[in-house]
Curated annotation (Swiss-Prot):
It is an enzyme of class 3 (hydrolase). Its main location: cytoplasm. It comes from the Bacteria. Gene3D superfamilies: 3.40.50.2300, Methylesterase CheB, C-terminal domain. Residues 4-121 form the Response regulatory domain. InterPro entries: CheB-like, CheB_C, CheY-like_superfamily, Sig_transdc_resp-reg_Me-estase, Sig_transdc_resp-reg_receiver. GO terms for molecular function: phosphorelay response regulator activity; protein-glutamate methylesterase activity; protein-glutamine glutaminase activity. PROSITE patterns: CHEB (PS50122), RESPONSE_REGULATORY (PS50110). This is Protein-glutamate methylesterase/protein-glutamine glutaminase 2. One of its GO terms (biological process) is chemotaxis. Residues 156-348 form the CheB-type methylesterase domain.
């Protein structure tokens, strides 16, 4: 049975383009196109779509207000269509916190290749959203972390260990929830979240405001410090290297790996090579298989591996593949994942 899709956008051009893209795929059924939230509400009640593509910036009632009302009245998988601006990125992360499954930038239609790539991406995201588990918005997602007692890590652990995190669909909120479970003093943390250029800096800023330690977008050649987390820039692979006993960030715009740039596999393979048994890797919610090869390599090099449990995943794709390969030591639901990881780190390199 085809996936029923509703397009909500105040732009006639964008509605027309998205409509044609959706109609080109036999697995999808375009049930309606709405120019504003009032039309959208009627169409949601009439057609009961499986997935909604929703513009953030709309007249009368904006996309965020409509999304908030929708998730309370009739939870539906929503893919946000976002402007490539700082304000647009900010609103996008607010939408994800409210329960949107995923987002995609507005289409750039300056070349046939760009059009085709965008069509492939939006169709993939709609199909992924249709399979997603709708989780309740985390009540604490937009509030700073509260102090609580955490196991203290030895100075040696903080200076020698490295934590690597990979995620895709549903990952922005999962990463925030995980980082909020960590104390201020941690080994360096490196993060790859599938995300286009123009959004990762805002994502890092949001994590920085809401967690106990410093979070920033990774820069080429910078030393990876304890008490810092580093986010892979959109459209660039993040790797780690080791120079003179210190971990450093390496960025590149190489080919997509496992269908993505940044790729979790690229990060994890570098972590396996340079951190080895001093690595702790976590694979979170996401569609597809990115990260499974890399976390298997970390396991083979003696690192510790964790996967998010199915119940708390928006999409149990990436963790499932890694578990299937026998590469995961601990499968833990998100609310307990941080504490489990901390227990492990507290047990190594005791002074």
């Amino acid at each position: 049975m085809a996936i029923k899709v509703l397009v909500v956008d105040d732009s006639t051009l964008i509605r027309s383009l998205l409509g044609k893209m959706i109609e080109s795929d036999p697995e999808l059924s375009l049930v309606g196109m709405a120019a504003d939230a009032y039309m959208a509400k009627d169409m949601v009640n009439q057609f009961r779509p499986d997935v909604i593509t929703l513009d953030i910036e709309m007249p009368k009632v904006d996309g965020l207000t409509f999304l908030d009302r929708l998730m309370k009245a009739r939870p539906t998988a929503v893919v946000m269509i976002s402007a490539l601006t700082e304000e647009g990125a900010d609103a996008t992360f607010n939408a994800l916190a409210l329960g949107a499954v995923d987002f995609i930038p507005k289409p750039k239609l300056d070349s046939p290749q760009g059009f085709n790539e965008y069509q492939d991406l939006i169709l993939e995201k709609i199909k992924s959203a249709a399979k997603a588990k709708l989780l309740k918005a985390l009540p604490s997602a937009s509030t700073p972390v509260k102090s609580s007692i955490k196991p203290a890590l030895s100075q040696r652990t903080v200076n020698t260990q490295l934590v690597a995190i990979g995620a895709s669909t549903g990952g922005t909120e999962a990463i925030l929830a995980l980082l909020k479970q960590f104390p201020a003093v941690m080994p360096p943390i490196v993060i790859t979240q599938h995300m286009p250029a123009g959004f990762t800096c805002t994502f890092a800023d949001r994590l920085n405001k809401l967690t106990r330690f410093n979070v920033k977008q990774a820069e080429e050649g910078e030393r990876l410090l304890p008490c810092y987390a580093y986010v892979a820039p959109g459209d660039q692979h993040l790797e780690i290297i080791k120079v003179g006993g210190s971990f450093k960030a390496k960025l590149s715009q190489g080919d997509k790996v496992s269908g993505h740039r940044p790729s979790v596999d690229v990060l994890f393979h570098s972590v396996a090579q340079y951190a080895g048994e001093n690595a702790t890797a976590v694979i979170l919610t996401g569609m597809g298989k990115d990260g499974a090869d890399g976390i298997e390599a970390i396991d083979m090099q003696g690192g510790k591996t964790f996967a998010q449990g199915e119940q708390s995943c928006v999409v149990f794709g990436m963790p499932k593949e890694a578990i299937k390969r026998g590469a995961i030591h601990h499968v833990v639901e998100l609310p307990q994942l941080g504490d489990k990881l901390l227990q492990y780190l507290a047990s190594v390199n005791r002074d």
